[in-house]
Every structure is written in structure tokens, then in C-alpha cells.
Amino acid sequence: EVFLMGCFSEILDRDILVDRVEKTRRLFAHLPEDALIVLEDGCYVKKDFRYYVHEQLCPHAHILSMNEDELQEYIGRRIDILDPDAVIPALETVHKNSGIPLVLVHSAAWALAYGDNAGMMRASLEGGVTMAASRFRSGDDINPQIYAQTAAMAPKEAAVTFCQQMRQQLGERICCVPCKDLSHVTNPTVVGLGDSF
């Protein structure tokens, strides 16, 4: 049902990258017609590799997923991730340039989907936020009870305001979920949070 393309940013040899991208493209013929194809972006060491991967795979993808750093690298500047007037143009740039119907971005403050049928991503965004927050506060010791406790935690107030403002400006084109308020966590795990998305 879902085909995730990722980890191309880990490849440092162009010949290997070209080979892996071509092998990935061949897999499309074996997917169900209604399969959802997701391209996971990355922080590429070799920036031209990112352009190549996007050029080759974006035409086949339904969702482009990235974190806040990858978003800012894409547009070539740092932005305030709690300022809708800065985030909206960034989303519009990625959406337009990639040609992918739906852009998913996860940050330390929120997770959002922008584009066609953004609302279909709400459960996935909420699940990603909850899983990342569970890992942040409990490391590898996540279990269903910890996940449920995390789901019940209050969100960051600034992120709630941001999501409300985004909805006011973009309507059905946006689905924005605030991250949990984890200011009380004294010994956080910060590695692997993005993998929740």
C-alpha cells in the first residue's frame, strides 16, 4: 500500500547512486496501482546528488517528506519555523518545484502536510508526533503504555498557535499537528526522532 524511498542521501558514489535510483524506478512496475509512493528527503553530503534524486524520482512520488533543516536547505535560507509568513512561502516553493502533490515536513515544533488532500495525513502526523515524543522521553524503552501516556500530553502552546494560523491562511491545503510539550524531560534521546515520520 505504501512504498517508501529513502536513504539516497547516504550514498557518496555517483555510479552507485545512479544504479540504486534506476533499480528503484524498476520497482514501480510491480506496485499496485493505488500504492502511495513516498520520497524521503535527506541532508545530502553531495548537494548535486539531491538534485539528481529529485529529478529522477519526484515525478513518481505522491508525498515528499523532509525535516525542518532539509526544508531550509531546499529554499537556501534559514527561517523561523513558528512564523507562518516564513513557512508558507517555503512550502509553496517545495511544492511547486518538486511537482509532488503533497509535502510533509516535521520539525521540533510541529508536523504538517501541505498540498492536495492534506487532511488524509492527520492520523499519520499525530502518530509520528507521538512516537517521536515517546522516543525523546523514553529512548528505546517505548511500549504501548508510554505511547498512550505521550499521546495524552499537552502540546506546545506556540505550536498550537502556529497550526491555527496556518489553517486560517491555507484552509484545506494544510494539515498541521503541534508537537508535545517536552520541556520537563531532563534526559532526552535526540537520535532517531525523524524516523517516526
Where are these regions (language model features)?
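Ribokinase/PfkB-type carbohydrate-kinase core domain
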Residues: E1-S196
